[in-house]
């Protein structure tokens, strides 16, 4: 899995002009699923995400997790994180998991995440418009194959 993590003051996702998911303070996740991803990748990602200390404490130190601040998560599927740009000018996406596998894996990821913190989602495979107010900015890349 490859996940772009953005600390946000608020974020929302819309599909065809209708708001699908909306959060206040928390994390916006852009989630890519790879063909080799397993249950252990899912567990690792969830554990890291809910415990990652990237929110400021009273002293202004990044010392609190999304769980600590009782924040929310907006999770968006993003197969383009597996783009291969080595050849030519058009990215290839053959490094991403096939849609059926990726959709099931993404759903399982969100269900497990929702056991820890409130989660809103987009719709897998939909054309989505994502709006956010990045807080910091703080943007982190989590790759479950690099641990």
Swiss-Prot record:
Gene3D superfamilies: D-tyrosyl-tRNA(Tyr) deacylase. GO terms for molecular function: D-tyrosyl-tRNA(Tyr) deacylase activity; Gly-tRNA(Ala) deacylase activity; Ser(Gly)-tRNA(Ala) hydrolase activity; tRNA binding. This is D-aminoacyl-tRNA deacylase. Its EC number is 3.1.1.96. It comes from the Bacteria. An aminoacyl-tRNA editing enzyme that deacylates mischarged D-aminoacyl-tRNAs. Also deacylates mischarged glycyl-tRNA(Ala), protecting cells against glycine mischarging by AlaRS. Acts via tRNA-based rather than protein-based catalysis; rejects L-amino acids rather than detecting D-amino acids in the active site. By recycling D-aminoacyl-tRNA to D-amino acids and free tRNA molecules, this enzyme counteracts the toxicity associated with the formation of D-aminoacyl-tRNA entities in vivo and helps enforce protein L-homochirality. Keywords: Cytoplasm, Hydrolase, RNA-binding, tRNA-binding. A motif (Gly-cisPro motif, important for rejection of L-amino acids) lies at residues 136-137. The keyword RNA-binding applies. The gene is dtd. Belongs to the DTD family. GO terms for biological process: D-amino acid catabolic process. Homodimer. It is found in: Cytoplasm. GO terms for cellular component: cytoplasm. NCBIfam families: D-aminoacyl-tRNA deacylase. It catalyses: glycyl-tRNA(Ala) + H2O = tRNA(Ala) + glycine + H(+); a D-aminoacyl-tRNA + H2O = a tRNA + a D-alpha-amino acid + H(+). A Gly-cisPro motif from one monomer fits into the active site of the other monomer to allow specific chiral rejection of L-amino acids. CDD domains: Dtyr_deacylase (cd00563). Signal peptide: none annotated. InterPro entries: Daa-tRNA_deacyls_DTD, DTD-like_sf.
């Amino acid at each position: 899995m490859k996940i772009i993590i953005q600390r946000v003051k608020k974020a929302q996702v819309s599909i065809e002009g209708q708001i699908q998911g909306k959060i206040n303070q928390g994390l916006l996740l852009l989630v890519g699923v790879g063909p080799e991803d397993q249950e252990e990748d899912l567990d690792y990602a969830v554990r890291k995400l809910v415990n990652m200390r990237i929110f400021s404490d009273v002293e202004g130190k990044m010392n609190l997790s999304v769980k600590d601040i009782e924040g929310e998560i907006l999770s968006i599927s993003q197969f383009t994180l597996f783009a291969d740009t080595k050849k030519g000018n058009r990215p290839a996406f053959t490094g991403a998991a096939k849609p059926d596998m990726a959709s099931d894996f993404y759903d399982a990821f969100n269900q497990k995440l929702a056991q820890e913190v409130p989660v809103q989602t987009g719709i897998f495979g939909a054309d989505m418009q994502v709006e956010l107010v990045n807080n910091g900015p703080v943007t982190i890349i989590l790759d479950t194959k690099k641990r």
